[in-house]
């Protein structure tokens, strides 16, 4: 292992100060006038608590004047006292990069959580604060990333090298869908994946680790966690740590990279907490005044450059199912495709609970996905929209009062809704049914058949939680057999 110039510079530039004030995770430190650390510099101090000594790291956020800097702690400050010595490392927080990080879990500081640090083989560390690629390095993409999930591939096709958002309230299936994407896309991808666990449940992180190990994708994946029980500074920076690892694979190794972030809302929430702790005046709904700026600093680095890409899938919690909330609203502008999960669809047991009418994609256009695919997607949306408009009439007067034409629309819409459901590999442990992967060709043909009325004779329940139309016909044969 070799030290980088950054590490050598940190040792020669080391300056010490003393803690003047501690308020939870916020620490004010006094330094000599000629050795004030720069913004984003990492500071370290030793804490002795219950007879054990450990290091705690801070990040400089503000210069207060009078030789004072205000820093945010990235670990608990229990046991920290006024007058304690703090050392300026002379550089921002940095994380290990390269092939050595694959197959391991790290914290925000790049310290491995599954093995001893000496077992991680790396030759370089990169600072987590980096500039985005310059404009002339960027390269747009319209190539479709096939997932094998019918509702996504048909109605909100994902873009290779694009940014994809999975929006939804609590308990509608965001994390399950992210885990499903890891299983499906990473398994068939062949490149490197990086997962950022931002402010989510530790249990889910453990489940993901076990699942990735069993599915064989762990060896090509680096995981970086800053979970719910971590200080806000950690939750704010952990996405940057993971992104830095992904950037190395893109820029140095010229790889196509998958970046999964769960959950972007927790990143925003941590920024709000840090902003309040720093004494900034809150903005709309209590969020930080620099919300758009913070989101932009992260999202602008998640991009594709000439010849290589970072494809990002981000789960976004929607507070109280309110899509006008500033946190999800700030995320929307950066995305190429949005998949919105509906509580109403989830309540009917239709998973993945994707809302086909509100989900969008930049490449849902005949010049990118082909005329047949586009025409079928439009017809499906038209039928579902017409069915939605008829629901008020049905609620008051009943289905029998509809015209024959409207009855056909409702009947086909119900088949489409059932056919949009699909067994997933992640949910096998709960359902006992193996997941299914459907090609885009079979998906388009299946929904075209429903729209044309070719399968009006098949009962609705035969379309529930199946793969392609062949599975529907097998299911229908079983239903007929059981009713004889």
UniProtKB/Swiss-Prot annotation:
The keyword Repressor does not apply. Keywords: ATP synthesis, ATP-binding, Cell membrane, CF(1), Hydrogen ion transport, Ion transport, Membrane, Nucleotide-binding, Translocase, Transport. ATP binds at residues 168-175. It is found in: Cell membrane. F-type ATPases have 2 components, CF(1) - the catalytic core - and CF(0) - the membrane proton channel. CF(1) has five subunits: alpha(3), beta(3), gamma(1), delta(1), epsilon(1). CF(0) has three main subunits: a(1), b(2) and c(9-12). The alpha and beta chains form an alternating ring which encloses part of the gamma chain. CF(1) is attached to CF(0) by a central stalk formed by the gamma and epsilon chains, while a peripheral stalk is formed by the delta and b chains. Belongs to the ATPase alpha/beta chains family. Produces ATP from ADP in the presence of a proton gradient across the membrane. The catalytic sites are hosted primarily by the beta subunits. This is ATP synthase subunit beta. It comes from Renibacterium salmoninarum (strain ATCC 33209 / DSM 20767 / JCM 11484 / NBRC 15589 / NCIMB 2235). The gene is atpD.
